[in-house]
Amino acid sequence: MASLASSQTEPNTSESPVPASMFSPEPDGEDSDCSLDGEPLRNGEADIDVTSKFVLVSPSAEQYDSLLHQLRDRMDEGRGETIYVIGQGSDGTEYGLNEADMEASVATVTSMAEQIVADMILLREHQEAGGKVQDYLVRKSVGDNDFLEVRVAVVGNVDAGKSTLLGVLTHGELDNGRGFARQKLFRHKHEIESGRTSSVGNDILGFDNHGQVVNKPDNHGGSLEWTKICEKSSKIITFIDLAGHEKYLKTTVFGMTGHLPDFCMLMVGSNAGIVGMTKEHLGLALALNVPVFVVVTKIDMCPANILQETLKLLQRLLKSPGCRKIPVLVQNKDDVIVTASNFSSERMCPIFQISNVTGENLDLLKMFLNLLSPRSSSREEEPAEFQIDDTYSVPGVGTVVSGTTLRGLIKLNDLLLLGPDPLGNFTSIAVKSIHRKRMPVKEVRGGQTASFALKKIKRSTIRKGMVMVSPRLNPQASWEFEAEILVLHHPTTISPRYQAMVHCGSIRQTATILTMSRDCLRTGDKAIVHFRFIKTPEYLHIDQRLVFREGRTKAVGTITKLLQSTNNLPMNSKPPQQVKMQSTKKSLHGKKDEQSPAAAVTEEASPSAAAIGVTAGAGAMQAQPKTGGGGRRRGGQRHKVKAQGACTASTGGC
């Protein structure tokens, strides 16, 4: 954005927050990134003048078609919605229209919205030098069982008020200051007792086509019926409530990588300030390229000087070289509209100050959430791909998987490939039913979360990290891959054979470093690293983001190359750890036609050993007591040794 770029160095030199008005377009300058009605057209239509603020009053047929084409493009860019400003042009004239011109312009925009089947919501009306200026939210109308979905991850240090804020937003009741609101969200008994979230929670906030909240809790139990909310809503905000405590960091990282949030809401307690895991969670969101906005809570109980100190530290953190954000303090509806329309640039960081007890500024936060547009883009003609982040076994239904549709279109009774299994194979399965937010639907598109009931498959064969893909993709699982990683923190040095947990989408598995482009890695180093999974192969993509962590060690990176596919390996080829584990578990004294995995590997590696037959089997039986650890460690092993000695003597193996 032109105005943002021109002022980039200005706000970074001061400690005061940046006013939101600086991001508004200048009356005498052109700003192609702002949502003006006079935006110059591309695609060879620049000869039709639509830069004047009066073009909407009585447009010609050519101008009307150009404006309609422009609105369609902006709706596509905004994933189904955009902010349209009436009374502003980019031809240098002063802003504002008189009453009659404004009425005619609104009628023109309403006509265009009807053509593209969209609703208009008046956001604000303000007076300028030339008259009135009105801002409208144009949102695409959806069907009865469809809605726009925006996922917001809620992170922050423990006791910052994450669950309390979500309880107030979703249930519409203010908190009593003693944990009343958060009790409605907890899923486990120990969470209710301790007041701390330990699992990934999901809560929804619905907005209708007029921008009003539709959440109405049940009068008796106080619970929310998701089906009724989805039926009334044109837009759903899905909150991913993550744990703030350090010991649940693994769960928080999985929520950020596996649930694919569009935005991240960082919670900061005004009385405690930036402490504990606040910087960790902010760094994680920045590493995954998720836009962040900040909510400062508990302003009703915090002294003014402490609140100002917290805001000053927060602005200093956001402007630091690691973040390079532009903090904007949101204080009124004008600030909300300006920040929401420019938030997708990922440079601006709005800061809200709220109280869950008094309800102060909660209306500004709800308005901002209503204006957020989903960031994920996907075309329906692409091959379908769905990542699994949880599994269930529902009585009377069978196996159910939940997760996120990454791309494409999935319909009822579609045949998909589920995998990879421990051998890297994919199994054909059929979709029995589809639910979105507990509401039955017939199809899901890219960027939407859903649950599928699958036919004729056991829950035990499915794990987190598996995918369901279209057969057109011809999927292949990989044991090894290369990634370019940046070490954010490590106490000493990282060298080959180092093992740590890799988070990549919904995948969460330990991987070993085989080789690196540098001898060793320290904090701040960047290198190309060759990884190998230790347990099962996974389905990966080039340019997929990953988080590499173990204890206090943290690194982020991007996959650059997939090195090895299981389709190119023998069926019995597994990592050495698995082969060794199986060879010690299974006894060699079974039926004569049975063969141990260790013997199978030996036979695969050496054809001569397979030709010898009995002698090779006797040699394997002789070696077994040694690998088992001696006769005294395993019950009854000494008798087996005697039996083996008699067997080898009779066959001449000795």
Curated annotation (Swiss-Prot):
Region (Disordered): 1-44, 566-654
Ranges for region G1: 156-163
Keyword line: Cytoplasm, GTP-binding, Nucleotide-binding
Keyword NADP attributed: no
Start and end residues of each stretch annotated as G4: 297-300
Cellular component GO terms held in the UniProt record: cytoplasmic exosome (RNase complex); cytosol
Residue segments, region G2: 195-199
Biased composition (Basic residues): 631-642
Gene3D superfamilies in the cross-refs: P-loop containing nucleotide triphosphate hydrolases (3.40.50.300), Translation factors (2.40.30.10)
Region (G5): 355-357
Bias-annotated ranges (Low complexity): 609-620
Binding site for GTP: 156-163, 241-245, 297-300
Compartmental location: Cytoplasm
Annotated Acidic residues bias: 27-36
GO biological process assignments: GTP metabolic process; positive regulation of mRNA catabolic process; translational elongation
Biased composition (Polar residues): 1-16, 566-585
Pfam family, one: GTP_EFTU_D2
Region (G3) location: 241-244
GO molecular function: GTP binding; GTPase activity; translation elongation factor activity
Keyword Metal-binding listed: no
Family classification: Belongs to the TRAFAC class translation factor GTPase superfamily. Classic translation factor GTPase family. GTPBP1 subfamily.
Function recorded in the entry: Promotes degradation of target mRNA species. Plays a role in the regulation of circadian mRNA stability. Binds GTP and has GTPase activity.
Name of the featured protein: GTP-binding protein 1
Organism encoding this protein: Xenopus laevis
Gene name of the encoded protein: gtpbp1
